[in-house]
């Protein structure tokens, strides 16, 4: 049996924010956390998210986009919502999990040139990393970075 704490990260589409957050937390503190992500209306993982994570040395190419219902009945230590919409519609079946929330800009809504859109994805990736580093630090987990 693993002593890793179980973390579920939720956003609407499970295509950008929660996918990047899953990749970051697995990479930076995966020895302490078993991390999953899901969405309330999942779509495909955004190519921009894959690209900016690759720039950070993290490969999320094979991450599937999952619906939150796939985790019904499973126990988690932490459920983190990374968008206001999902916080409001978050299922109640996560029992005693500690629920945390921070709204991050949706990079999938970015407009402009490809470079301008990638800049938004990079900024959100970096904001997620700071948030998740603090999440792990407060739980006495030394990140691997």
What is the meaning of each model-derived region?
Residues 14, 53, 79-80, 128:
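Conserved small-residue
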């Amino acid at each position: 049996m693993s002593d890793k704490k179980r973390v579920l990260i939720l956003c609407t589409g499970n295509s950008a924010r929660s996918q990047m957050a899953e990749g970051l937390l697995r990479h930076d503190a995966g020895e302490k956390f078993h991390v999953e992500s899901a969405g309330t209306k999942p779509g495909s993982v955004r190519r921009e998210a894959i690209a900016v994570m690759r720039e950070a040395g993290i490969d999320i190419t094979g991450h599937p986009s999952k619906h939150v219902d796939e985790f019904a009945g499973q126990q988690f230590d932490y459920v983190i919502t990374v968008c206001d919409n999902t916080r409001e519609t978050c299922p109640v079946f996560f029992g005693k999990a500690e629920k945390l929330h921070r709204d991050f800009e949706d990079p999938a809504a970015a407009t402009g040139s490809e470079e301008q859109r990638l800049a938004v994805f990079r900024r959100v990736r970096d904001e997620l990393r700071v948030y998740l580093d603090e999440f792990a630090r407060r739980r006495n987990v030394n990140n691997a970075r």
